[in-house]
């Protein structure tokens, strides 16, 4: 009986090891998983987000994030900011949803929802939902990025570190202690 159960279990495990995409989507115990745009659905990130008294469509085709080993999420997506004033459009290009506190470029950000943007002067800005600046930091230009996309999150150089990109402009992100 025990041998039969073990054989069935091994068959199920071998049959589920499937494609690299399936394996990439499944976090192993104790590991974080970087999420690509195709993995961020309206069940995780709403189609529309609230910011400065209006709602804007989230561009889930331009999204990225991290599912942490404990099941908590950090997600980011570009937004359609066409209904906002020029002053807000200059700063508000994307939206962050995070269930955990983050460190962005060394600055701590509590869990929550925020508007973000990359400014022409090389700064990255984080705003509360009322469009008030919380902080701004220097972003960096990654000329070595081979295939720049409008927004993505990639694994950083060390475990638990990530890079949030808008094209080739980026900031370092990690879960805060």
Residue ranges and their predicted role:
Residues 23-86, 135-177:
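Primarily secretory-pathway and cell-envelope proteins
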Residues 81-129:
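Mid-length scaffold segments of soluble, non-membrane domains
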């Amino acid at each position: 009986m025990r041998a039969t159960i073990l054989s069935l279990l091994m068959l199920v495990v071998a049959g589920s090891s499937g494609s690299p995409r399936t394996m990439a989507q499944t976090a192993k115990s104790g590991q974080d998983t970087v999420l690509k745009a195709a993995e961020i659905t309206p069940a995780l990130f709403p189609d529309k987000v609230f910011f400065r008294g209006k709602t804007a469509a989230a561009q889930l085709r331009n999204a990225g994030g991290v599912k942490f080993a404990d099941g908590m999420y950090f997600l980011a997506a570009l937004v359609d900011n066409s209904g906002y004033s020029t002053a807000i459009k200059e700063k508000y290009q994307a939206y962050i949803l995070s269930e955990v506190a983050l460190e962005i470029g060394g600055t701590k950000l509590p869990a929550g929802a925020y508007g973000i943007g990359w400014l022409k002067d090389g700064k990255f800005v984080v705003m509360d939902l009322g469009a008030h600046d919380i902080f701004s930091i220097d972003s960096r230009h990654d000329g070595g990025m081979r295939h720049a996309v409008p927004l993505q999150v990639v694994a950083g150089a060390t475990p638990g570190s990530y890079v949030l990109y808008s094209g080739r402009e980026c900031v370092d992100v990690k879960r805060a202690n």
